A protein has these predicted regions:
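PRPP-associated nucleotide enzymes
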Residues: 1-157
Length: 157
């Protein structure tokens, strides 16, 4: 774990690189993924999650791997098959969830994911994203804290 703050310009460049990677439908440069994921992990620490939950796709999976590694937490994947959502492995009852995505551009999924986790007796303590979130996403999370790579101790305040 890097304990030295990352300059804001370097973090912004990494987020830009990750955004280009996501829009080009590829995982992106390893250095950008490491930097952005580390910043997300730093931003999540105050919420003390016990598990990272992520949709099963390449971009989100790569971020979840690094964030989970940085926080020393397990990862739970959300699978979708014929419109049905499932968790694998299921989180422990009472789990404190960091719900992670590279981008929450499709916020229509958020209520369904939160409901799925509530049925699993897990509490979403933070919604995390690599890319900046919109006001619509903020409204969809209904008061749950939202963290991004920009809100990190790796960025000078």
């Amino acid at each position: 774990m890097n304990t030295h703050p990352t300059p804001a310009s370097q973090l912004a460049a990494a987020v830009d690189e990750l955004h280009r990677a996501v829009t080009a439908d590829r995982a992106g440069a390893a250095a950008a993924v490491e930097l952005v994921s580390g910043a997300i992990a730093d931003a999540l620490r105050p919420y003390t999650p016990t598990v990272v939950v992520v949709r099963d796709n390449l971009d989100d999976g790569v971020l979840a791997h690094v964030v989970s590694r940085e926080l020393d937490l397990p990862t739970v994947r959300i699978y979708e098959d014929s419109g049905l959502l499932s968790l694998s492995p299921p989180p422990d009852p009472g789990a404190r969830v960091a719900l992670l995505a590279a981008s929450w551009h499709d916020m229509s999924a958020l209520p369904a994911l939160r409901l799925l986790l509530a049925h699993a007796q897990a509490e979403v303590v933070a919604v995390a994203a690599a890319l900046p979130v919109t006001d619509a996403v903020l409204a969809a999370v209904d008061g749950t804290p939202v963290v991004t790579a920009a809100a990190s101790s790796r960025t000078p305040r």
